[in-house]
Amino acid sequence: CPACDLHHYPRISPAIITAIVKGNQILLARGVNFPNQKMFSVLAGFVEPGETLEECLRREVFEEVGIQVKHIRYFKSQSWPFPDSLMIGFTAQYDSGQISEDPSEILEARWFDADHLPLTPDKKVLAGELIDWFVRSQTRESC
């Protein structure tokens, strides 16, 4: 503000998004609020105050599908203007637990092989890039 010399910065809502890999499979889910109910995607969720990104990832994954993860690695980020979010992408490895969907958020969650994927987001968005990363990682391993 020029009158009081205060700087105002836009508020953004940080959110994690993660590709979870178990051996040669990726965990994908259909969300309750997905516009296309046939589409599966990676898990995502908003960071809570006082929480690190890694803590958020572990919490969101456990809340949404009931599993534990390990070996969390930063992938990349993407601005998501609606609702003023910054998506921070990660990859993670499955650690333990059985899939148990939170019905308020997840309709279905399953493990998929790279060559048997359902309908997924376009590679232009971070979710699609994470899934593409998984597919390419499996192609490299089979060479």
What are these regions (language model features)?
Residues 42-76, 90, 98:
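The catalytic Nudix box helix
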